[in-house]
Each structure stands twice: as C-alpha cells, then as structure tokens.
Design a protein with these regions (language model features):
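C-terminal catalytic histidine-bearing segment of alpha/beta-hydrolase fold enzymes
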Residues: 2-63, 78
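Helix-start (N-cap) detector for alpha-helical repeat units in TPR-like alpha-solenoids
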Residues: 85, 101, 119-120, 152-153
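Alpha-solenoid helical repeat scaffolds
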Residues: 89-90, 120-124, 155-158
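Short coil turns that delineate tetratricopeptide repeat
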Residues: 116, 149-150
Length: 166
C-alpha cells in the first residue's frame, strides 16, 4: 500500500500533532487552535525584536522589512494586508523608549504613507515630535490632522503650544 506522503504528487502543506491526553470531547478546540497556528505561522513579525536589541543598533531597514513581511502575508492571503496603525505606533513609541528616534520617525512616516486620510497618524507623529522639542514640526502635523478631522483635544494642544511660544 502506498502512503500519501510517499506519493510523487505529495505537495500538501500539512502537519500532524498528536494529543495523547485528550479525548473526543476535548480535542476540537485544541486541534482547531493548533491548525490555525500552523496555517498562519507566517503572520507573526518576529524580526521586530532585532531593533530593540543593542547589538542591532546599526539596523535602519525597519520599514523595508515590515513592507516585505506584509507583502508576503498579502500574497499568502490573496488580498492586501497592511499593518494596523496601532501596531506601527506601538513599535515607533517602543523604539523611542529604546533611544532609537531615527527608526521611530521612519515608522511614523510609514504610517502616514499607509493611512494618509487618517488624522490619528498625524497626531501620533505630532505628539512624538512635541515630546522631542520639535514644536514647529508638531504644529504642522496637528494642523494636518485637523484638516482631516476636527478634534477638540488636538485644537487645545495647538492652542497650548501657540500660547507657550508667545
């Protein structure tokens, strides 16, 4: 008898996992979870940790690596998948805490490139610049944000900046 795995036509992307301590009633959720983890193993962006580690301080290709990763995801899924705004902002703020403002700025700019019609991407970069003492650049971004969506909180931030400058 020929085993499927020995067939010349074997090209099925499959994985077998035994659950010896489970029974008919406990296995469905565990097996479904394991299957989803297997089929979407390509989704996780594990390379991000490289940029937080001091030995990788010379790395500056963060946007290109993220772009390449999400192109791979898009190809596998069959439609365009973009990183969420919140992910990019979280990575950017994380990098700023690790004293990598150069990379943080790249990520904020990438977020603006991906989501140019979302006010929140301008706010995120604006707050970052404000916290690094670049008030004039921050003001431009806050005004850009308001041109997309009026927000009372951002209007107050602008007023405070302008009052402090006088």
């Amino acid at each position: 008898m020929l085993r499927l795995s020995e067939s010349e036509h074997w090209n099925i992307n499959a994985h077998f996992q035994d659950f010896p301590d489970e029974d008919h009633f406990s296995i469905p959720h565990l097996a479904t979870y394991a299957g989803m983890k297997f089929f979407y193993s390509f989704y996780k962006f594990e390379e991000m940790i490289d940029y937080y580690h001091p030995t990788y301080s010379d790395r500056s290709d963060i946007v290109e690596r993220i772009r390449t990763h999400y192109q791979l995801i898009s190809e596998k899924m069959g439609y365009e998948v973009k990183p969420m705004q919140s992910y990019i902002n979280t990575w950017a703020y994380g990098l700023s805490h690790f004293e990598r403002p150069d990379l943080a700025i790249q990520l904020f700019d990438y977020n603006i490139e991906l989501y140019p019609h979302h006010s929140s991407v301008y706010n995120a970069k604006g707050y970052f610049l404000l916290n690094t003492g670049k008030e004039q650049e921050a003001l431009k971004l806050f005004y850009q944000s308001l041109s997309i969506k009026e927000e009372e909180g951002i209007r107050k931030v602008i007023e405070e900046i302008e009052l402090s400058r006088n």
